[in-house]
């Protein structure tokens, strides 16, 4: 990737890995919202050992930065089913590798879509959430539904949710209830921050992607992505 980007080295490395691995693609993609996006991010493609190490490393650096700058403290890394499951385990291992003095005792947990009624039972797998500070990790926040479900499950256990870290913040406003996308509006991340009062961090934002694109992408892809940001950027 060219050196014109102002992104920190680990963000540049993550962005390049996402593009080279087919995780981040440019073109024309219809989203669940029916919007036509010029880019698409699918963290499920981080399935090779090399790419899994890259995403775990980028998450770990983002989390440690959040600890240093925002005082983020946690005992458990929680991954909502399904994409959050491999993320939480890989991230926990990486945190123990890069900061063993502080994070070697961090555990991970994830949820089942349906509660198990035999064996150990319940819908939480991994470390018990009882009395623990919980950090949620996932790929993106689109409508926020999965994160609300995770927060409610954690709260139901009577535990402390301390924050959320995602791979990508699309910085995109939620679809308007009346279908009029010309109206300004908040993002799903902004609404979650407001509703639950918890910090949310991202490895990359759409602004980061556009900054990084200038080192390698075609002028058409850059313009399409900038136009999409201008049309759908959230107010928060």
Swiss-Prot record:
UniProt cross-references to PROSITE patterns, sorted A to Z: PUR_PYR_PR_TRANSFER
A GO term, aspect molecular function: orotate phosphoribosyltransferase activity
Record's keyword terms, sorted: Glycosyltransferase, Pyrimidine biosynthesis, Transferase
Keyword presence, Glycosyltransferase: yes
Residues given in the record as 5-phospho-alpha-D-ribose 1-diphosphate binding sites: 32, 82-83, 112-113, 116, 118, 138-146
One biological process term in Gene Ontology: pyrimidine ribonucleoside biosynthetic process
Catalytic activity: orotidine 5'-phosphate + diphosphate = orotate + 5-phospho-alpha-D-ribose 1-diphosphate
Transferase found in the keyword field: yes
Pathway where it operates: Pyrimidine metabolism; UMP biosynthesis via de novo pathway; UMP from orotate: step 1/2
Residues binding orotate: 40-41, 142, 170
Record CDD domains: PRTases_typeI (cd06223)
Pfam family, one: Pribosyltran
GO cellular component: cytoplasm
Binding partners and assembly: Homodimer.
Similarity-based family: Belongs to the purine/pyrimidine phosphoribosyltransferase family. PyrE subfamily.
Protein name: Orotate phosphoribosyltransferase
Gene: ura5
């Amino acid at each position: 990737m060219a050196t014109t980007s102002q992104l920190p080295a680990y963000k540049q490395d993550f962005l390049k890995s996402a593009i080279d691995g087919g995780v981040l693609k440019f073109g024309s993609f219809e989203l669940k919202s029916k919007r036509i996006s010029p880019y698409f991010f699918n963290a499920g493609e981080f399935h090779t050992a090399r790419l899994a190490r890259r995403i775990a490393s980028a998450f770990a650096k983002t989390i440690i930065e959040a600890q240093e700058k925002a005082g983020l403290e946690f005992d458990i890394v929680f991954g909502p089913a399904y994409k959050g499951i491999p993320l939480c385990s890989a991230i926990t291992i990486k945190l123990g590798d890069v900061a063993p003095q502080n994070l070697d005792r961090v555990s991970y947990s994830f949820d089942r879509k349906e509660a198990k009624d035999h064996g150990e039972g319940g819908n939480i797998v991994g470390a018990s959430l009882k009395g623990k500070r919980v950090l949620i990790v996932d790929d993106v926040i689109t409508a926020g539904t999965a994160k609300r479900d995770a927060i409610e499950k954690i709260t139901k256990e009577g535990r402390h949710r301390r924050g959320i870290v995602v791979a990508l913040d699309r910085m995109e406003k939620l679809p308007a209830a009346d279908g009029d996308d010309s109206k300004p509006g908040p993002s799903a991340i902004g609404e979650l921050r407001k509703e639950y009062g918890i910090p949310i961090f991202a490895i990359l934002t759409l602004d980061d992607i556009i900054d990084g694109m200038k080192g390698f992408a075609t002028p058409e892809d850059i313009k399409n992505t900038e136009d999409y940001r201008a049309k759908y950027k959230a107010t928060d």
